[in-house]
Design a protein with these regions (language model features):
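Catalytic cores of DNA base-excision repair glycosylases
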Residues: 1-173
Length: 174
């Protein structure tokens, strides 16, 4: 998108869906992402005349609620928009964050998105740059060392694993 000079809402909204699909194809799931991005852009133009700055004038709670009303935007995407685009101090919880925390026993396996997010926000200063960097580091550790098959022996967080190894989900009851 950067190479095609399409980083503005106006430029993206003017594209036909097929054009946008081709541009974001390398990101994977391009058809679904195209629909969701178009839903966001349509909302932005219908309610805020295409102005992200006007949308971002809303308080964080209201902005998050409005983002969650858009078809295809869930908590992780809404919080990513809040943190990375609107520069709001809200912690993003993704698969890697969950996996790293739960395997180290730092949070219960049953913890949902809101519980994990509240854990971070209760223990870190509300600083968007800190949240951004912390999340990026967890994603990196998760991607490189804590995938579906863990590589604990190489992980920089290995020394903080429980003595008996990674925590696993409780057994499913019949």
């Amino acid at each position: 998108l950067r190479q095609a000079d399409l980083l503005s809402a106006e430029a993206l909204y003017s594209l036909r869906p097929e054009e946008l699909e081709e541009l974001i194809r390398p990101a994977g799931y391009f058809r679904m992402k195209t629909r969701r991005l178009h839903n966001l852009l349509r909302y932005l133009f219908e309610h805020y005349n295409g102005s992200l700055s006007t949308l971002f004038e809303l308080d964080t709670e209201t902005l998050r609620e409005q983002l969650l009303e858009i078809n295809g935007i869930g908590p992780e995407t809404a919080d990513s928009i809040l943190l990375y685009a609107a520069n709001r101090p809200i912690f993003v919880v993704d698969t890697y964050t969950n996996r790293v925390l739960k395997r180290h026993g730092w949070i219960d396996y049953e913890a949902d998105y809101a519980t994990v997010q509240a854990h971070f926000q209760a223990h870190l200063e509300p600083d968007s740059q800190l949240y951004n960097e912390f999340h990026a580091l967890l994603v990196r550790v998760g991607h490189l060392y804590c995938g579906k098959t863990p590589r604990c022996e190489e992980c920089p967080l290995a020394e903080w694993l429980p003595a008996d190894g990674i925590c696993t989900p409780p057994e499913e009851l019949p």
